[in-house]
Each structure stands twice: as structure tokens, then as C-alpha cells.
Amino acid sequence: MKKILYVATVAEHFYYFHLPCFKLFKEKGWQVDVACGGERELPFCDNRFKISIKRSPADKENLKAYKELKKIIRDGGYDIIHCHTPMGGILARIAARGERKKGTKVFYTAHGFHFYKGAPALNWLVYYPIELVMSAMTDCLITINDEDFAFAKKHLKAKKTVKVNGVGYNLSLIHI
């Protein structure tokens, strides 16, 4: 059985945007696991790992979340790790480094970069260098708008960069 792990800061992100994707993977025979914070119940998932990912890159509690996530990923034997939200994406991509060497694919969906034309300089100083480094740990970077797609293609280092209109999947990317 193929396995996918979704990672984000909070369960509400998945509840409001990704349940149809969970359902699709289940219908195709995949094991669907989720790692995130929050109490909301999530249908269509086999295992729910409650980890407390903080939104700030400087929050020291993210070190604990990273260690938990690394163990989940190492023990899970996932084919795909699909991460969302800035900190969920950062922690999952770092935690998955070893498994990528074994063939696990890491997807990151950028639901709008925090650095964009007209964004505060602080956003560029903090988030752009982080995403530049993280993109090198990304097999497929999924963007949802033209500005992010063009920027990512030109300046970031993901193996593959695609644009999806809104939230969803281009099924040709994952061959399920």
C-alpha cells in the first residue's frame, strides 16, 4: 500500500481545503496520515499525529515538533510527504531529508509566499532566504498564483515547480 503524510500547522487548514484530496487518495487505496496541531477531527485519514507546530520560525517549541515529525517520517515509510503552511513546510522538509535519499518525494504547496511584490522588507529578509534553502529540499513546489510560480521558477531550487489554480492536485504529478 502506498502512503502519504500531510503536514501543516493546524488541522483546520486540512479541514477547509484538503478533505477532497484525502478522499481521493483513500479511494485509490493509499494510506493517508496527517501531522498537525489542533483538535478538529479529520475524516479520510488513517493516522492523525498531533504535533504542536508554532507559526514563528523563532519559537523554540518547533524543535520539539521537528523531533516528533522526524520520528513520524522515519517510522512511516511514506511515498509522499505533502507539506503546507510556512512552518509545517519548513519542519517537514528538514525532517524528511534522510527519507528523500531513500526515495520519498516531498511536495510543498505555497499558499502564497510571505515575500511578494510590495511585501514588507522584513518578510523578504526572513522568509525568502528560508524558502530558498528549503526549496532545495523539495521535489515538487506547488504554487497557486502566477506571481509565485514565476518567482519560484526563476529564483528557487525545487526539482519541479508547478502552478495549480486554487487548491487541489494535478494528478499527472503523482501517478495515483
Residue spans for each PLM region:
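N-terminal subdomain of nucleotide-sugar transferases
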Residues: 1-37, 76
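Short His-centered aromatic/hydrophobic patch
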Residues: 83-89, 110
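A short beta-strand/loop micro-motif in the catalytic core of glycosyltransferases
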Residues: 81-82, 134-145
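Conserved nucleotide-sugar phosphate-binding/catalytic loop shared by glycosyltransferases and other
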Residues: 27-64, 72, 160, 164-165
